């Protein structure tokens, strides 16, 4: 016997003991966020406790609604739990990394197919969390996929792609095969799985592994100029990427190595300054750091040395979506906001908000920039606007604004001010005029230069995070926070002399979660 918790629809009911058939079968039917689970409840009563126990069950009332927990991010993706015995956050030991449901880390298998953005992520150390979206904003989490097995062990990080040419032979007349590539953690070998029902069910390839070379994190994509697949994995040799090539996804040839890279490889092509005749390849590693150059189908040739992408303390395991339609044309990235704290919550860790990547010339160098996807506008509930106003010490323009979810955009001339900043959830995001840098909580100093005398900043503020983008994404910083309960409303402040605000927009945001207790 053990304490269990039960969801009635989306309502969490707690406070009685029972035995549970916990794990859903692999072919279980899915609804938006519900799963059918059979429960066998046995109530033990002893002595004078009979009446109290029965009364407690009769009077069981909803506690915390799923997705409305106090520290649940409201527009950043987090995982839910599927094992019924772990739905109660009060059970000690369930909410630390090492096998609990509700955990996620590296985003994996980001792929677009037939109108759906698929998001996978490492979950509970042994499978992939799975969610789909029509708009990159609202997510429906489906039951976990690619569970561990005795042969391969836990399912570690990887990638996904659509097999448009059916080189695998897994496709059908009606459906192209979705392919997932992952590390089988038992021997740290590279494996493949496929789906022919739009990612709802997956079959692991019978002759796994497809690449016996250790270590991990296979990134696989189709290289059109030579009609072959490219796989990039992390090490060995230590702190290196290894490139492989294949025509049929079964026989792989080692092509080359690339040094000074660590974990979670990703590689994609972008036009420089929007010029399709000047495309570059970008090779990025675990923390988003990247090199820019050319790829000839065998080797990556560096044209510019490694640069940092994000200056925050909670940004890791970056991945971009594969198979984005040509008519869309965007390169879209997510990352794990590693290290966030969510005490007493039935989930752990969150992902960044999806961002578009672009390659721009900044101060005579090529710079990878990231900026929130335009679909965030679907969440705007109310907008407050100011134009051409003077901001001075003691004059807080935001004094009448309430809430905890915001998309804030400001363009300003520092003028005579020493600093201009926002205090949100008790944390500062500040531009310092003399030093010409932006700091957000623990963020490394983000050195920025004015454009036509102006600084542009954008802040995405969720319950447990602040993402900062400066000069339309030339510099960014992702940080997790712990908000103060019943903390002060957001505030704009200026130190020293006046600053001139050319434009300020504060958009209050709606939750992305169904029935999350918000309008």
Q: Predicted regions span which residues?
A:
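Surface loop/turn signatures of beta-propeller and other carbohydrate-active proteins
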Residues: 53-109, 121, 137-172, 199-222, ...
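Beta-rich accessory regions
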Residues: 61, 70, 74, 296-316, ...
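Entry beta-strands of beta-propeller and related beta-repeat scaffolds
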Residues: 116-119, 168-180, 227-231, 276-281, ...
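Short, low-complexity, charged amphipathic interaction modules
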Residues: 27-51
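Structural motif
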Residues: 127-129, 188-191, 239-242, 289-293
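Bacterial N-terminal signal peptides
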Residues: 7-15
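Conserved Ser/Thr-centered positions that define the repeating blades of beta-propeller domains
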Residues: 133, 193-196, 243-246, 294
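Carboxylate/His-rich catalytic cores and anion/metal-binding grooves
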Residues: 157, 175-204
